[in-house]
Regions:
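Short helix-capping/turn signature of helix-turn-helix
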Residues: 22-23, 200, 215
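Short, acidic, Ser/Thr-enriched surface-loop or helix-capping motifs
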Residues: 98, 153, 223
Length: 430
């Protein structure tokens, strides 16, 4: 049955808006060419979207630069403002962007481990408000949060699985209270990093891959056939709890010590480096920075030491080999179950190891499994979480603003169809 005129208009409007998001400003002629719509239909939708305040003339094209065909249309970027929040054990990072995802301001603050719940929440919320003010955003339409822990698929609430600070779990509710007009949602940090790698990073050519997060702790995100897979309880990818050989005791339901976490988290990486005579300079920047320093330093020295060493592997070489041995245990487990074809070493430590560490892990996987698997190093590093949170917030805002009934409404489309506060959106569900 053919679509009704109103449905056809809505479909055409969304198609045009998506093209303007993906391609940037376009003329009516370019919209006609890209959409395949007739000239009158394009003229109608341009007028309709302009009246709704979603697009505007942003310039002219062509040598003569005059006439209706020369007008270039773009999304009204300040129609809505978005915030992305990256919550870590040691602090918070915030970025505020416009509707097309252009970052206008960003900042981060450390939060001490012994800070009370109230003071920690106040620091985090105040940072969001300050960055929004610096960005010139009078109000935030959408706030996307990335945090460690499990996100319940039914409620969208963050659940602790590894003894995280109480303020992590209370941040969504506190932000929603301080920003009552905003749509606030939370997603597991590693899932957001995978989204960023799929959209903007090294996995753009992959519909199926696994991201292995190597930062303060460990985690994994699973993307199969283009969709993120969360599992029945939202816990897909809790690889830190994977039992592994060589630890004093297996992990428990409340503590991942003794699991893969004990082999590949930043503290374990620093200890492994010290065992091989590779050490980082003393720093107050934290264990993640120390792990990044030892891995990056080893990568920088490995070529020279391989050439100079006559009596067995040099320290940097031995350290990277030992680290690759450890990472291969986790990667091989994922490969045996999922056969993803590609594993991305993500996070700050994955980026520090780069192609050198990725090649070592891939070599080991090639000897451990018959399933062909490419191992790649992230190019986004620790910034992937914030980027993924921003992409999720942008998707959610555009979903509301671009939908029929949401177009041009002063509340930005808030209504019965809007997801409830705290519900994670923006990534495909199984």
């Amino acid at each position: 049955m053919p679509a009704s005129p109103s449905t056809a208009r809505a479909i055409n409007d969304r198609l045009a808006l998506r093209l303007l998001q993906q391609e940037g400003p376009l003329t009516a002629g370019q919209l006609k060419q890209l959409t395949g719509l007739s000239r009158p239909t394009v003229a109608d939708l341009v007028e309709r979207l302009g009246a709704a305040g979603l697009i505007a003339v942003v310039g002219e094209a062509g040598e003569r630069r005059r006439g209706p065909n020369a007008k270039v249309y773009g999304i009204v970027a300040d129609r809505a403002h978005l915030a992305a929040v990256d919550v870590r054990t040691e602090g918070v990072a915030v970025a505020v962007a416009d509707l097309v995802g252009r970052v206008l301001a960003e900042a981060s603050v450390p939060i001490a481990g012994d800070a009370g719940t109230g003071p920690a929440l106040e620091q985090a919320v105040t940072l969001v408000e300050r960055v929004a003010k610096e960005a010139g955003a009078e109000r935030l339409h959408t706030v996307g949060i990335g945090a460690p822990g499990l996100v319940d698929p039914s409620s969208g609430e963050l659940r602790d699985s590894t003894g995280l600070p109480e303020w992590h779990r209370r941040l969504v509710a506190t932000l929603q209270e301080r920003l009552p007009d905003a749509r606030v949602s939370v997603e597991n940090e590693t899932n957001l990093a995978a989204l960023a790698e799929q959209r903007d990073g090294v996995a753009q050519d992959r519909d199926t891959f696994v991201l292995l997060w190597l930062g303060h702790g460990t985690g994994a995100a699973v993307v199969l056939d283009g969709a993120l897979r969360r599992g029945a309880s939202g816990g897909t990818g809790e690889i830190g709890f994977l039992p592994v050989p060589g630890t004093a005791a297996p992990p428990t339901s409340t503590d991942c010590e003794g699991g893969f976490h004990s082999l590949a988290a930043s503290a374990a990486v620093v200890e492994l480096a010290a065992e091989h005579g590779v050490s980082a300079e003393a720093s107050e920047a934290g264990v993640v920075r120390a792990a990044v320093d030892v891995v990056r330093g080893a990568v920088a020295r490995v070529g020279r030491q391989e050439a100079e060493s006559l009596d067995g592997p040099a320290p940097a070489v031995a350290f990277l080999d030992a680290l690759a041995d450890r990472l291969a245990i986790g990667v091989a487990s994922v490969v045996a179950i999922l056969d993803p074809g590609c594993v991305v070493l993500g996070g700050e430590v994955g980026q520090a190891g780069g192609a050198e560490l990725a090649a070592r892990v891939q070599d080991r996987i090639g000897r451990m499994t018959p399933l062909p698997t490419e191992v790649r190093a992230t190019t986004l590093g620790g910034g992937a979480v914030l980027r993924g949170a921003l992409l999720t917030a942008r998707d959610r805002a555009q979903e509301e603003l671009f939908e029929p009934g949401g177009v041009g409404r002063p509340d930005g489309g808030q209504g019965p169809s809007s997801p409830p506060p705290g519900r994670s959106v923006g990534l495909s569900r199984p």
